[in-house]
Amino acid sequence: MPVTHIRIENYKSIKRCDIDLNNITALIGANGTGKTNILEAINYFYSNLTENNISEMVFDANNKFSNQVKITLTFDLSNFVIISKTQINDFADLFDDNTEKSRHSEYFKSIIALVSSQKEKTISIQMSQIKGRGIQWSEPFQKRTILKSLFPFFYIDVRNLDINEWAEVWNVLGELSKVSNSERKTLEKQVRDIVENDIETANKVKAIREVFDSSKLSVVPETSKEFASSLSKIYFSGEKIQQKGRGLQYFSTGTNSVKYIELLLRAINEIARNKMKEPVVLIDEPEISLHPNFIDELADAIMVLDSKLKPIISTHSSRLIKRMLSFESVTLYNVKLENNYTVTNLMKRFQQYSPSSKYRVLDDHINSYFSKGILFVEGETELELFSNPYL
C-alpha cells in the first residue's frame, strides 16, 4: 500500500490528527467538521514536496499564537525494495549499453537506500512550516523526488469539478503513458524525420520557428508527463471527450460526473497495475449530483481497484458507505468538531452473526454512522417519545 500513516498538526481546524491507512478509508461526518481540511492538508504536503506552493492560510484557525504546521506521511517501500533488488540482479543480462544499465541500476539502488536502515521498509517524511518562513523538510530534495515518482498523487475534488472540460483526465493519462528519455528522443527524431522529408510541412515548421525567433521567444520543453499527454492526444487525433457520439454538454451533471470519476479511477488503476508506482488517491464528496444507482456504480468502481490502491474518501452519503461496507477492506473514521477543533475517531463495523451468515444492514444502521450519538430504547412508548421532533 502507498501511504500507511498520516499525521497532521495545527493545520486550520486540525490540532492533531492521526490516521492509519491499512484499507480504503472513508471520512464521514457533518458539514464543517474538517473532512476536507484533512484532504487539503495531504494535498498541501504533495504540492510542496518538490515545488514551492507556500500558503500562509494553513495555520491553526483557533489559536493565533500557534505558528507552526506539521504534516507527516509514512510511505511503505517494501514492494519497491523487492522489485529493485530483483532488477539490479537482472540488469547484466538485459542491457548491453553500460550507460543505460548504470542509469537504471543507480535508480534502483537509490530506492533501496531510502529505507536501508528500516526493518519495516517504511520512511516518514515530515513537512514543517513556521509563519513568515519557508517550508522545512525532514529529508533532502533528491529523496522527495524519488518518493513523488513512486507515489504519484491524484486529488479528485468533485465540488470544484468542471464536468464539461476533462483536462485532468489527460494529465492522468500522461502519467500512465509516460515514456523514458531514450524513448522520447527516438520519437522526437522520428517526428523530425517525417517533417523534414515533406517539403511543405518542413516550410510551415520553419515559418513557425522564425516567428518565435523574430519575437525573441522560445518554447519550454514539456515534462515527461506533458509529453506523453500530448502524444496521446496526437494518437487519438484530438482531446475533446464525448459519450455515445454526443458532446459532454448534452448530458446531465450526474452522468458526466460519474463517468469522469470512473475514467480517472480506471486510468489510475492501470498506473498501479502496469507501472512501478503506487498512486495516492483522494476523493472529496464523489456522491455530489449522483442518482442512487450512480452512487452504487461508483462504489463498485472504487472497490474493484487494484489492492495497491487505498483511496481516502470524504463523503456524506450513507448509500455509498452502505455499498462499500459490503466489502471487508474499508475503514471508517468519524470526523467531528470538539471545541472548534477537528477530531477523528476510528469506527467499528457492524458485526456479522457468524462467518457463514450475512447480516442485513439497513439504511437506519448506516445512518447511525453519521449521528453524533445513538440512544437505545425498549418498547413502542419510548420509541414514540424519543422520535418526537420537538424534544
Would you name each region that the model predicts?
Residues 51-58, 131-146, 245, 319:
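Short alpha-helical segments and helix-capping/turn motifs at coil-helix boundaries
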Residues 77-81, 160-163, 317-320, 381-382:
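Conserved nucleotide-binding/hydrolysis micro-motifs of P-loop NTPases
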Residues 372-391:
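Conserved helicase/translocase motor-coupling segment
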